[in-house]
Amino acid sequence: EVSGEHKNKIVPQIEGTKKALSFVKKYPDRFGMLIRCRPRFEKNIQELDTFISKHREFIYGLKFHPYTSQLKITDPRNYPYFYLAKKYNLPILVHTANDKYSKLIYMDRVCKKFNDLTFIAAHCELLSDHLITIEVLKNNPNLYCDTAWVDMKFIKLLKANDLMDRIMFG
């Protein structure tokens, strides 16, 4: 079975999160962290809830990578994590790309269903012309995007569409 995860040994979520936290705690004035959620591979919502509660000041959001998890963001297995984000007022960053798991149109659906949460579409649908981003941003006030792997021409197009307040640079 294809797991969707990298072939290298994957560190369990809580173990990896603890390692990241130890680094962030050394430089709390310079770093915060996002917790990567992998609901297809790990069922640890209670443990994660306890961890966030204990270390909330260092945790800036949750992160999903649909392609490597081979799980669309619209999949109900993600929902317990969304409720956790709501509980702790955390944004949810989702890697988006032009593949069968990561399309920005899935963000449109989840932003509408969970309109009380804040979502960030990383890469504005990588490996595409990014144009769907404009429509999805306009339709969802709870959605932001970042500029990682996005060319300057598209950023200018976002500006022309009066969407600069919805961009995270980086």
Question: Model-predicted segments: where are they?
Answer:
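Catalytic domains of carbohydrate-active enzymes, especially glycoside hydrolases
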Residues: 1
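Active-site gating/metal-coordination segments in enzymes
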Residues: 4-93, 143-144
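Catalytic pocket-lining loop regions of alpha/beta-barrel enzymes
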Residues: 74-170
